[in-house]
């Protein structure tokens, strides 16, 4: 029989109702019924990345669509938690509201001591520190999720350390560290020491991420721009190779690659 979605619901209630119907043990969708928080995690991550892609391309039609998909993931996880009697979407929203109000006393509590952006950032970090301590954090680095993408986690670790004064003075000093890591990597490559090569390459990546931070550049955006640049240039080279019916060898590829700049 057909499952009817309740009428006269607001948009949020409607999407919750849809998810609950999909997960109905008797009349729901077999695929949706089988899902749990762990099986959905990869889809949640994918949707978040697709939101970022829509933002970077400036496509608001796509952004509207992708935000809806990401919202659906939030609802899904909340409904699954509700089934386990852990929390529901109202709890999620309430906690988010409380957190934002707590971190913005200059808006909601009329705290006149917070006036500038610097004051706001300082108080924001202060509140986050208190929140981490309340969760049992013993180090300023505690609470940086190990499930984050490696680049994102590296950046968060660096920012936390920097707030405690453990940081390079400027981008020039950071660049010196990058050069130092390049030299160390070169030495290990000459020795063909695979274990040390991996270690030094990791140090180089970490230092490059740090340099991006010190230059005030978003490292993910920097890498995505470089990816797009490579993709555009490669496709141009590819097109020229095919158009001129050139043999696909390294010499021709290098020549056309230089032309595609």
Question: Which residue ranges define each predicted feature?
Answer:
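Flexible "arm" and connector segments at domain edges
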Residues: 3-66, 72-201, 205-261
